[in-house]
Amino acid sequence: MNKQISKKPAQRTIALNKKALHDYYVEQRFEAGLVLEGWEVKSIRAGRVQLRDSYVVFKSGEAWLIGAHLSPLPNVAEYMKADPQSSRKLLLNKREIGKLFGAVQKQGLTVVPLDLHWHKNHVKVEIALAKGKKTHDKRETIKRREWEREKHRVLKSHG
């Protein structure tokens, strides 16, 4: 009579920001909650979210996600004015905000979102303290990636 309980992964990815990994060296990662309205959660459940050109700013001791695009569902657009590009407050500890703000001010780093995921029943965003790559660094990363692929191809065909 033992029932097997299927465990879902605790963290299900909703959206990735691949461009951030291409444009920045990630130094440290943080997980933050998001303050969302009901229609925004429904849009996220439908997968209508994009993080490509988004970033984090600090205003009056709070962290805000700017540029994340949440497209409203068609039925929401009928009865309310939904702004898909509005800024959304990030939920972080005071200590984490201080650490991020200090690194941005002193070291010239930036804070970018890496992914949006479900943690239990809450939407979380993984943000990273990052340093921008220069053009030659991006080219070097691409060359290294292509070399790894070629190496695996050769080893696979000979092995």
Swiss-Prot record:
It comes from the Bacteria. The keyword RNA-binding applies. Belongs to the SmpB family. One of its GO terms (biological process) is trans-translation. Required for rescue of stalled ribosomes mediated by trans-translation. Binds to transfer-messenger RNA (tmRNA), required for stable association of tmRNA with ribosomes. tmRNA and SmpB together mimic tRNA shape, replacing the anticodon stem-loop with SmpB. tmRNA is encoded by the ssrA gene; the 2 termini fold to resemble tRNA(Ala) and it encodes a 'tag peptide', a short internal open reading frame. During trans-translation Ala-aminoacylated tmRNA acts like a tRNA, entering the A-site of stalled ribosomes, displacing the stalled mRNA. GO terms for cellular component: cytosol. This is SsrA-binding protein. GO terms for molecular function: RNA binding. It comes from Coxiella burnetii (strain CbuK_Q154). It is found in: Cytoplasm. InterPro entries: SmpB, SsrA-bd_prot, SsrA-bd_prot_CS. Keywords: Cytoplasm, RNA-binding. It holds the Pfam family SmpB. NCBIfam families: PRK05422.1 (NF003843), smpB (TIGR00086).
